[in-house]
UniProtKB/Swiss-Prot annotation:
<keyword id="KW-0963">Cytoplasm</keyword>
<keyword id="KW-0067">ATP-binding</keyword>
<dbReference type="GO" id="GO:0006281">
    <property type="term" value="P:DNA repair"/>
</dbReference>
<dbReference type="InterPro" id="IPR020588">
    <property type="entry name" value="RecA_ATP-bd"/>
</dbReference>
<comment type="function">
    <text>Can catalyze the hydrolysis of ATP in the presence of single-stranded DNA, the ATP-dependent uptake of single-stranded DNA by duplex DNA, and the ATP-dependent hybridization of homologous single-stranded DNAs. It interacts with LexA causing its activation and leading to its autocatalytic cleavage.</text>
</comment>
<dbReference type="InterPro" id="IPR020584">
    <property type="entry name" value="DNA_recomb/repair_RecA_CS"/>
</dbReference>
<dbReference type="GO" id="GO:0005524">
    <property type="term" value="F:ATP binding"/>
</dbReference>
<feature type="region of interest" description="Disordered">
    <location>
        <begin position="323"/>
        <end position="362"/>
    </location>
</feature>
<dbReference type="GO" id="GO:0005829">
    <property type="term" value="C:cytosol"/>
</dbReference>
<dbReference type="InterPro" id="IPR020587">
    <property type="entry name" value="RecA_monomer-monomer_interface"/>
</dbReference>
<dbReference type="InterPro" id="IPR003593">
    <property type="entry name" value="AAA+_ATPase"/>
</dbReference>
<keyword id="KW-0234">DNA repair</keyword>
<comment type="similarity">
    <text>Belongs to the RecA family.</text>
</comment>
<dbReference type="GO" id="GO:0009432">
    <property type="term" value="P:SOS response"/>
</dbReference>
<dbReference type="GO" id="GO:0140664">
    <property type="term" value="F:ATP-dependent DNA damage sensor activity"/>
</dbReference>
<keyword id="KW-0742">SOS response</keyword>
<dbReference type="GO" id="GO:0006310">
    <property type="term" value="P:DNA recombination"/>
</dbReference>
Length: 362
């Protein structure tokens, strides 16, 4: 009986492959690489919270939160990281609010960035579809879902009601896009705004725009909220942002982290690197002094951050050590790798340079 079932299954598989092509169905054990490839978010803390070292390729990501919480900043850091690895990024600016100077300050090469400012939601999603289907774009960002206004609403009069029009538009678009996104291994990031549901007495009244479709199709949903101000004396120089991974299909969800978003600079990479290096015993903190290896790098957190910024080679080396210590692939072509013996013997600060393989990019 078991042999008959197996023979029937083999016949069915051959028939499917004949009708739809080789690889249309397979046993998961036959897959050459089942590991989900990822691209760094540009933030060590967020990469760790995501669980796989960055945003997964071929998947949909939703970033949402209140106004001025840092959603666009986080998305632009992803653009800079994709470009740093030699990839191509596209930005669909439905809000018409992208600041090129700020993007450049975050490390984005604006000369190579593909930018579209569509006149309607249909146009923006058609442009996204064309870019994704080309297979030549690594990252597409839609900023934002709330600004993808259906053409019927634009052509209508003020005050006209268009119930569920945007939700139907998003549902149709995502049905079409999800397959192409997976096939071309493109990362699609949708930035979204929050609204409040009327008449909710119990529970959270907040919801995101564009209906439920994006919630279902997203592999990762990331909530960003402003926590507190960062001050230098009396001057406000940035904000602390709390990031929560609300949904994650490729790693355990509900991880949280905090990032410093500095005005005109974006996410403070030196700050989060220093904090995580201390957590992993790669940087020694004794009182107010920070030491890396045999060298004292600064008294107080701000001075230690300044030292890292002034020594990019040491910063890149330390960043790769932190990534490896947290189970992530190193980013830089050359890095110091700490072996288990080194860690056990406390030699975490020695400068042993060794070449590592560049993170694979599918």
């Amino acid at each position: 009986m078991a042999d008959q079932r197996k023979a029937a299954l083999d016949v069915a598989i051959r028939k499917i492959e004949k009708n739809f092509g080789k690889g249309s169905i397979m046993r998961m054990g036959d897959a050459t690489d089942m590991k989900v490839a990822s691209v760094s978010s540009g933030s060590l803390a967020i990469d760790k919270a995501l669980g796989i070292g960055g945003y997964p390729r071929g998947r949909i990501v939703e970033i949402y939160g209140p106004e001025s919480s840092g959603k666009t900043t986080v998305a632009l850091h992803a653009v800079a990281e994709v470009q740093r690895q030699g990839g191509t990024a596209a930005y669909i600016d439905a809000e018409n609010a992208l600041d090129p100077q700020y993007a450049e300050a975050l490390g984005v090469n604006i000369d190579d960035l593909l930018l579209s400012q569509p006149d309607s939601g249909e146009e923006g999603l058609e442009i996204a579809d064309a870019l994704i289907s080309s297979g030549a774009v690594d990252l597409v960002i839609v900023d934002s879902v709330a600004a993808l206004v259906p053409r019927a609403e634009i052509d209508g009069d003020m005050g006209d009601t268009h119930v569920g029009l945007q939700a139907r538009l998003m549902s149709q678009a995502l049905r079409k896009l999800s397959g192409e996104i997976n096939k071309t291994k493109t990362i699609a990031i949708f930035i979204n705004q929050i609204r409040e549901k009327v008449g909710v007495m119990f529970g959270n009244p907040e919801t995101t725009t564009g209906g439920r479709a994006l919630k279902f199709y997203s592999t990762i949903r990331m909530e960003i909220r402003r926590a507190e101000q960062i001050k230098n004396g009396t001057d406000v120089i940035g904000n602390k942002a709390k990031v929560k991974i609300v949904k994650n299909k490729v790693a355990p969800p509900f991880k949280r982290c905090e990032v410093d978003i500095m005005y005109g600079e974006g996410i403070s990479k030196t700050g989060e690197l220093l904090d995580m290096a201390v957590e992993n015993d790669l940087v020694d903190k004794s009182g107010a002094w920070y030491s890396y290896g045999s060298e004292r790098i600064g008294q107080g957190r701000e001075n230690a951050k300044k030292w890292l910024k002034e020594h990019p080679d040491s910063m890149n080396e330390l960043m790769d050590k932190v990534r490896v210590a947290n189970g992530m692939e190193p980013l830089n072509e050359k890095s110091t790798k700490e072996t288990a013996d080194d860690k056990a013997s406390g030699k975490t600060g020695e400068n042993k340079q060794e070449t590592i393989e560049e993170a694979s990019k599918e």
